[in-house]
Amino acid sequence: MALQFTEREFIPVLLGGDINAYSVARAFYEEYQVKSLVFGKYQTGPAYRSQIIDYTPNVDIDTMPVMLKIVNGIAQAHADKTIVLMGCGDNYVALVAQAKDADELADNIVAPYAPYSMLEQCQKKEIFYELCEKHGVPYPHTFTFTAQMLNAQGEAPAEVLDQIDFPFPMILKPSDGIMWWQHEFEGQKKAYEIADRAELEQVIRDSYASGYTDDLILQDRVPGNDEYMRVLTSYSDRNGKVRMMCLGH
């Protein structure tokens, strides 16, 4: 059976090409029967060739000049519509928020994001754990490694690592996920399960040698597979009040 589409008073414009972009486009289709315009970097990924998506690759879509030219062009071409602009990835959200703050988006574009200064703080993991501490939300035992702890050779001193009071294997992840992916290096991962001291020293050395300058978060590993994971998604209005929440398992 062929998919059915309905013309609405808005057009979803999504930035990104991975499963996040596809999931948002699917949600728009299931609720409103609209086709989303999706812009990713490459001709690949879950969003590419999907029947519910009009996908356009552009290797520079994650740069401000190219993003503005594309989305403002869409807004101009569809002046009678509201353009709902969403970033499907931390870097795209930051890009859109910065453009919104600078008032560089066309008047008929809606970008549902808080000011960039607030987003920048919220996406840093050590800030998140400070909020957990403040509000009594439990989280794994954590040690924060900073660039200032490195010695002159760009390595983690033994006396610093000796302060970690939880065992291997441990989890290591960057505090600033946006900056992290801007400095690629061999073997780079979103998060690591560190087996021993030698691997910990190597990952720290490689991370900062790449040009990454923010903190690294080391945590006690919580045992169990993905069946024990949960994800909480919430929506807040323009006044910062949470209006809905959805727990995923």
In which residue ranges do the predicted regions lie?
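Glycine-/Pro-rich loop/turn segments that contact NAD(P) or position catalytic residues
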Residues: 106-109, 116-138, 156-157
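Acidic/histidine-enriched active-site and ligand-binding environments that engage anionic O-linkages
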Residues: 161-171
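Domain-scale recognition of functional cores that engage charged ligands
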Residues: 121, 126, 144-150, 158, ...
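Glycine-rich phosphate-binding loop of ATP-grasp-fold ATP-dependent ligases
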Residues: 141, 169-205, 229-231
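ATP-binding N-terminal substructure of ATP-dependent carboxylate-amine bond-forming enzymes
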Residues: 1-115, 150-159
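Hydrophobic anchor at the start of a short beta-strand
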Residues: 34-37, 139-140, 216
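Phosphate-binding site of ATP-dependent enzymes
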Residues: 195-249
